[in-house]
Amino acid sequence: MKIKAVGAYSAKQPLEPMDITRREPGPNDVKIEIAYCGVCHSDLHQVRSEWAGTVYPCVPGHEIVGRVVAVGDQVEKYAPGDLVGVGCIVDSCKHCEECEDGLENYCDHMTGTYNSPTPDEPGHTLGGYSQQIVVHERYVLRIRHPQEQLAAVAPLLCAGITTYSPLRHWQAGPGKKVGVVGIGGLGHMGIKLAHAMGAHVVAFTTSEAKREAAKALGADEVVNSRNADEMAAHLKSFDFILNTVAAPHNLDDFTTLLKRDGTMTLVGAPATPHKSPEVFNLIMKRRAIAGSMIGGIPETQEMLDFCAEHGIVADIEMIRADQINEAYERMLRGDVKYRFVIDNRTLTD
């Protein structure tokens, strides 16, 4: 079936309207009318071929929310009319250790929502900057937020799970001191989630202008990471630090803030590598630096349910489909609080 979308035909061209083809629903498929799609910084990197392997036409978008309009005859979990979401994963091998553990995000054959090989036309997946999507029911997520919050739920499908998964894995909660480095699309979700989990949350920023905003998001304390005295006041005190900053920076500034056995987890994907950290800062206190990538389907559903229970959504700015190129330029300038979301109804305007 032919539908409307927005994508790019090359790395050097702006995004533009295009027609794409979606498969007809199979026995286990769910067909979703997309209401809103979040704009992730990785969309920009991929569509401009700043990350290797982009294939064109490229239709980005992996923060998808909408309503079920049709299901295959073997679908058991969903029915037409249900509010649902699709995140970064639309398929995986389903039988490896990672898939059996519900960690499809680490499956070696995980299929991303866009720019991954697929038997469907045109040979690679096309994302949520489009009217509809057809997905196997295993990778569809139920949304329990009220309809009026649906647009602000969209970024939870990437920014939400990217921060929730490491916070849960490293057991953020009451009695734990948790740092969140960066107050952007990822960081603002990390602050909200860590606060809701009951941790003592310290936000790190290089911008004095973000100090009050971080407190409003739920931070108990805010530190200007360029202020040596403020940083020194927190030496050897953190159980866990969630580092959301993608730009290369000095990791040693933050590893020294960890307690013995503390961990700093990186979730920002840098275009160029970070400088190697000072190993003695790690071995002298058995500190660790780790990484984390989105989350599996069961954990993503858990995150959505947690957010619905605690009234958590992203802080967003709604845009029309014809404003995506402008939104990309604004993202590069850091001119967004904190996530753009496309109103997909405007694809037909």
Swiss-Prot record:
Q: Give UniProt keywords alphabetically.
A: Metal-binding, NADP, Oxidoreductase, Zinc
- Record note on cofactor: Binds 2 Zn(2+) ions per subunit.
Tell me its EC number(s), please: 1.1.1.2
Q: Which GO terms describe its molecular function?
A: alcohol dehydrogenase (NADP+) activity; oxidoreductase activity, acting on the CH-OH group of donors, NAD or NADP as acceptor; zinc ion binding
In which residues is Zn(2+) 1 bound? C40, H62, C158
Please give one Pfam family short name: ADH_N
In terms of PANTHER family, this protein maps to:
ALDEHYDE REDUCTASE
Protein name per its UniProtKB record: Aldehyde reductase YahK
Gene name as annotated: yahK
